[in-house]
Amino acid sequence: MARVKGGVVSRKRRKRILKLAKGYYGAKHILFRTAKEQVMNSYYYAYRDRRQKKRDFRKLWITRINAAARLNGLSYSQLMHGLKLAEIEVNRKMLADLAVNDATAFTALADAAKAKLGK
């Protein structure tokens, strides 16, 4: 029985990795071993950062809400507590959007929170 060298399979495997590494800098898109390492790292970064993105956006929203709340004489935590007492259920994404794009609506919410806090 003849020995099978597997050249077609190996070439296909290498070609697939190098195709994934297209656009990488330097040897990372040319040499198979470095390309393979970089593709593996890229998958890791993509997985990690899909989770990190959620945290980053939440941080951004909280920062924006805090800045707008302080313009209305409240801290972020006081505003959130006041909204909870007033039974106003609006998420941080929507609050941040109001703070940036519709200051009058945000001020109305801040006033409702102030009223419930007794300020």
Curated annotation (Swiss-Prot):
Keywords: Ribonucleoprotein, Ribosomal protein, RNA-binding, rRNA-binding. The gene is rplT. Belongs to the bacterial ribosomal protein bL20 family. One of its GO terms (cellular component) is ribosome. Pfam families: Ribosomal_L20 (PF00453). GO terms for molecular function: rRNA binding; structural constituent of ribosome. Binds directly to 23S ribosomal RNA and is necessary for the in vitro assembly process of the 50S ribosomal subunit. It is not involved in the protein synthesizing functions of that subunit. This is Large ribosomal subunit protein bL20. NCBIfam families: rplT_bact. One of its GO terms (biological process) is translation.
